[in-house]
Regions:
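Domain-level signature for soluble enzymes in the chorismate/prephenate branch of the shikimate pathway
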Residues: 1-375
């Protein structure tokens, strides 16, 4: 039998496979109708494991057993997605516990940020809410999350990611711990400046203060001043405030231009951070389960079983529903060695059918899924 004949036989088999697949999906559709009527869950892990064991047993060698399992995992995954889609169309998913609003009520809002006046968080707050907003600052990110949870603030402004230094891992952990939700974001271009008392010459400086990340981002500039002592503080604005209050010309701070204005300091040198394209993304957080009706990004977190292929199957919900995943991060789960929680950003709105479909599948098949916000 030549190659052409062999390919012809494969084509005939493939036609039968496709016909059987469509027949199977029609029965899956009927299963979905039954589950809509009875309220039975789509995902039945025990049933699927039993089915896969039977499929493996039908094969004649280990290679085919592995391949058959992969094939039927995909078939059953598509069956579930069909069922989720029918549940969405039938309105059986219920609405998400978030209320859509035309705009955020910010006129009388109280906003909290971590740091001090002149910090980048302060600037992000002013850009998002306006300079006349009622605001106060706290020492830690946890304090900010507590303020909105307890009601002393309506919104918090928190840095979640820097384009050069990466994520602010503490913020991710706090989003899991607190029942607070993301409703907006603000991106601020970062330009670190060397600040000193008015009239100070750079040659007078002996000590420079700043946040550890800012010192790291300015490493190239600082390397040209090896005799300077570098001291880390928890916020750039605190560094500027310290230099201003102590009145010592041998001290300088690395912070933004807004900190110089806030504390009456002189900019001794601009752009001391080596990366020109350096930005920080800030999130706007509230304790209300709301989202803007024109929101276009969704953030969630979830855990997956510690087994082969589990993350792959979870991510397939984004592919099937044609949702663009823009970010995925992992964080270790406390007290569970080598297990991770995944944070995912993707494009969409809670009102979209594809989003509802994906979220239902993720809720059923992942562990401890939490919606962090639509903004």
């Amino acid at each position: 039998m030549d190659l052409l004949e062999l390919r012809g036989k494969l084509d005939q088999i493939d036609e039968k496979i496709v016909a059987l697949y469509e027949e199977r999906m029609e029965i899956s559709s009927q299963v979905a109708d039954y589950k809509i009527e009875t309220g039975k869950k789509v995902f039945d892990k025990a049933r699927e494991e039993e089915k896969l064991a039977k499929v493996r047993a039908l094969t004649h060698n280990a290679f085919n057993a592995h391949g058959a399992q992969e094939l039927f995992e995909q078939i059953m995954s598509m069956s579930r997605k069909l069922q989720y889609n029918k549940l969405v169309q039938a309105g059986s998913l219920g609405r998400l516990p978030f209320i859509g609003v035309d705009r955020l009520e910010t006129e009388q809002a109280r906003v909290v940020f971590q740091g001090a006046e002149g910090a980048y968080s302060h600037l992000a707050m002013q850009r998002y809410f306006g300079e006349q907003v009622k605001s106060f600052h706290v020492d830690t990110f946890r304090d900010a999350m507590t303020a909105i949870e307890e009601g002393s603030a309506d919104f918090a402004v928190l840095p979640i990611e820097n384009s050069t230094a990466g994520i602010v891992s503490e913020i991710y952990d706090l989003l899991v711990e607190f029942e607070n939700y993301i409703v907006g974001e603000q991106i601020i271009r970062i330009e670190h400046c060397l600040l000193g008392l008015p009239g100070t010459d750079i040659s007078q400086i002996k000590t420079v203060y700043s946040h550890p990340q800012s010192l790291m981002q300015s490493a190239k500039f600082l390397a040209s001043h090896e005799d300077w002592k570098q001291v880390s503080l928890k916020n750039n604005a605190f560094a500027a405030e310290k230099v201003s209050k102590e009145g010592d010309r041998t001290q300088a701070a690395i912070a933004g231009e807004q900190a110089a204005k806030a504390y009456g300091l002189e900019i001794l040198k601009r752009g001391v951070n080596q990366a020109e394209n350096n930005s920080t993304r800030f999130i706007i957080v509230t304790n209300q389960k709301i989202f803007r009706k024109d929101a276009g990004k969704i953030s969630i977190c979830l855990e997956v079983p510690h087994e082969s292929g589990s993350l792959y199957h979870i991510l397939s919900h984004f592919i099937y529903n044609n949702l663009n995943m823009t970010k995925i991060e992992s964080r270790p789960i406390e007290e569970r060695d080598w297990e991770y929680r995944f944070f995912i950003d993707f494009e969409g709105n809670f009102a979209d059918g594809a989003v509802k479909n994906a979220l239902r599948g993720l809720r059923d098949e992942a562990r401890n899924m939490k919606i962090l916000g639509n903004y």
